[in-house]
From Swiss-Prot:
Residues 208-244, 302-337, 399-437 are mitochondrial matrix. Belongs to the mitochondrial carrier (TC 2.A.29) family. It comes from Bos taurus. It comes from the Eukaryota. This is Calcium-binding mitochondrial carrier protein SCaMC-2.
Amino acid sequence: MLCLCLYVPLIGEAQTEFQYFESKGLPAELKSIFKLSVFIPSQEFSTYRQWKQKIVQAGDKDLDGQLDFEEFVHYLQDHEKKLRLVFKSLDKKNDGRIDAQEIMQSLRDLGVKISEQQAEKILKSMDKNGTMTIDWNEWRDYHLLHPVENIPEIILYWKHSTIFDVGENLTVPDEFTVEERQTGMWWRHLVAGGGAGAVSRTCTAPLDRLKVLMQVHASRSNNMCIVGGFTQMIREGGARSLWRGNGINVLKIAPESAIKFMAYEQIKRLIGSDQETLRIHERLVAGSLAGAIAQSSIYPMEVLKTRMALRKTGQYSGMLDCARKILAREGMAAFYKGYVPNMLGIIPYAGIDLAVYETLKNAWLQRYAVNSADPGVFVLLACGTMSSTCGQLASYPLALVRTRMQAQASMEGAPEVTMSSLFKQILRTEGAFGLYRGLAPNFMKVIPAVSISYVVYENLKITLGVQSR
């Protein structure tokens, strides 16, 4: 007779037996043969429940909330294939063994810095024969029915650029795991991210339009406040006017995201890194270049967004009418007004956003990632909000100058200005504070934008067949 038992090794702890796998459809006398018994201490029951739920969700094909024997065997086979891919990605030397240096290198590539002692501690937990290296059998035996603590899990749970949309698509693209690339899940993540961005931008569009108005029209002599700005917009064009410019802002998500992702993947190959995931500085370079390519491709849409947000009632009948009138009156060059400060703003925004997010991620993983790399909703939202806020704060003066240059030609009697002359003019007439006009509504929309995009992203993932967090 066969019996499958898993024992979690514990020393000197009160243990309780739990059985939760049985084979349905078998004669009653055989049901006890195919079972899984797990012995765990009572104080670790919460960890056990999370672990059980993860395994059941992964293998439950008929969605009845439990695994029968056939589903369990299928889960083991499928999970072993995934573990093989992870093992190969960690085995930098291709010698069939993983040592402490390879563990440190793999985590360092993701921005997670650990000491050699910490790497050796991880190694010892899996090393059965005391060689201070892990072969495939040791790796498989440890992880097959053990809470996962691996590189793909960190990538899976800590996606940032794909999930959060605060209206400025200047973040460094996310990495995808080997499995996500091979199964085609990557494009589902991008579609979910695009849909989340569309909903998020639409919900926060009134604050975004107010920011643009304050960037262009607010000054010492015209001290526009938030309440006054909303009142002015509603008085001029009614409640619908709060969403002016939102259509083009949503429309540009798809081409910009697609171009940036494709450019990022090509630049990764040009960098020539043999790692599956890039190091932090390589990600910054590749992400900034990809962002520059994407922004260059869709920049006329950025100009249209600003002009549509600033338009008066009846000025344009729609986006195409706006584009035709700009082309006829100002020429093709008008569609690239503010291009230089926009490009210069990519590096501080992307660099600081990435650095802050990776620092917060690393701090959390070092301190709290005991059984899983899953940070939970609130930690993820907090990290995304803080990193986006810091990135925007650093690049905001360039964003303000860009917006004023985009709007300048549409203002009657406005002289032609350059980036440097506009900086000097603002500093001379308004001081350093003038470079941060509209910052308040911009920051006010960060938390709702991040929260809305996260909720919509998670729901769209389920709809598109991506395994939920």
